[in-house]
Amino acid sequence: VSIAVTSAAIGSVAGKFVEKAWNLGEKWITEYFKNHGKEAQEKAKENALSFLTKVAESVKVIQDNTKTDPVTLEVINTSFKDPDFSAVLQRAIIISARTPSEDKHKILARLITERLLANSEDMISLASSVAVEAISALKAKHLYALGLSVLVEDIRPTSVPKGLTQKQLNQAARDWWLKNLSPLIHKVEDLSDIDIRHLVGVNCIEYELFIGRDLAQILKSGFGEWEVDKFLSEIEEGKKLKEYYEK
């Protein structure tokens, strides 16, 4: 894959990021894989370029959907002068080079994009390094399991309309959970006890987080009283979520 063609196709600012990152990344990959076979080295470069392309696409989406211009050439140039950003980017490129997984590439790309926009000492910056390292120790299904856990435990709609009838509230809550569960729940169907133990072992989750928790009460949070028991017993996504939490 030609880096020049890739960066040109993506656009000016995002493309510049790819060029600058690849100028460094190719050297990092060459050094890391110097004692490996030629085919492994070439595949590593292909994987890393796929990841960088996803970073650029992520940057472009932010540019296109924001009235301001959050990612400028100045922001990019400043980031590459930051030792912490450079170290996080290096680790992300090496991790991406070791796998063809698009799921991992997308998540790494999101992390690097968020880090690109963050101040050097805020929580996003501090968490980025930890998150990148965690990805290196996880399979894609583990990442989906973590995403599902965060969704169920922490994420709720910013607001629920006032004055809904019980029927309307039941429908609103059901629709919200279906929309947000659907991309994740089918990705963790084959998650085993060994997978859960692995997540505990790499300090991504704690068993105590789930002990004694009533799933129905968790799903009511943010909505109030709605037909959650019916959702968990009759709707496919609800039944799968219940099975997942009972593992």
Predicted regions and their residues:
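Amphipathic, membrane-inserting segments
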Residues: 43-90
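Short helix-coil junctions and helix-kink-helix linkers
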Residues: 165-190
